[in-house]
């Protein structure tokens, strides 16, 4: 499973242990609490309240949510769900999450399972006016719909690849560098199958002519091929480690224990702040695309929160949220309303920086993309294989 920084990215935003669980950290631009509206009336009114249970990196902090509420009329009570799809699905199905929360946000792939089990409700796109501004290729993500209905709204989007230290690894343009024997002991991958398996599958499909149809949703045979490849390289001591969590990934680069690794783009910027000359490679095999999607919990419909939930999602695409999230996280909300909002509120946000961040992500998605799927058809087999890798 968030990433390029853009101008004005505050120091300190990288202090937590995991990318998907980063909590608010950083400063809000001067005058931000007084910025203009999102195009909604500002008359005194009772605020609709929504309990938003989402990945920590979607949080814009207390000051951000205050402005969001003032502009949108929706008061957000934000809770970090940890992002791991397994526990999220379990808490919705057998826990009390559906009794507590109204709207959730998590890495895409679980929507169909949740819809089939009756745990989430479809969105009424006609009630989300700003959805028309969402970039078309974000709307085309394959796992957003089920039975012709929209269950996932692509709220944050990016594409991941390889981090390399320039004076150690030279020019890297392929995932093959991770498996290059010349770099033995100086490469690493994340201890998470949702990222490391698809990276390996993308490499084998495009550079080794492996018979793999969809790297994000492997068949049992394809998964076996990929995992045997990884296990062999682990036993050969190709990898320095399989890193776990933000801090370890960053530390490996900062200490130059690792010269090349698959990882999250914000780690590049954090490592640069520590004096490491590293870069995010453009892989010829293609990027791993991912989206963090907003879903409507079934119980919110029962509690009469449907209108407020749609109002929340509409406001997420109105521009302020995208500008604020980009400033805090370097993440992109896939709408040009962000640039329009920054232009109209240049005292709070840098329009050039907002545009630069959007163009950077658009450029990635103009090339070859394979979508991350956190709930592939054989996800339980993925779990089994990954444990074998850990034990190898």
Question: Which role does the model predict for each range below?
Answer:
Residues 1-21:
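N-terminal secretory signal peptides
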Residues 296-366:
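Mature extracytoplasmic/periplasmic domains
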Residues 359-392:
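Conserved C-terminal helix/tail region of periplasmic/extracytoplasmic solute-binding proteins
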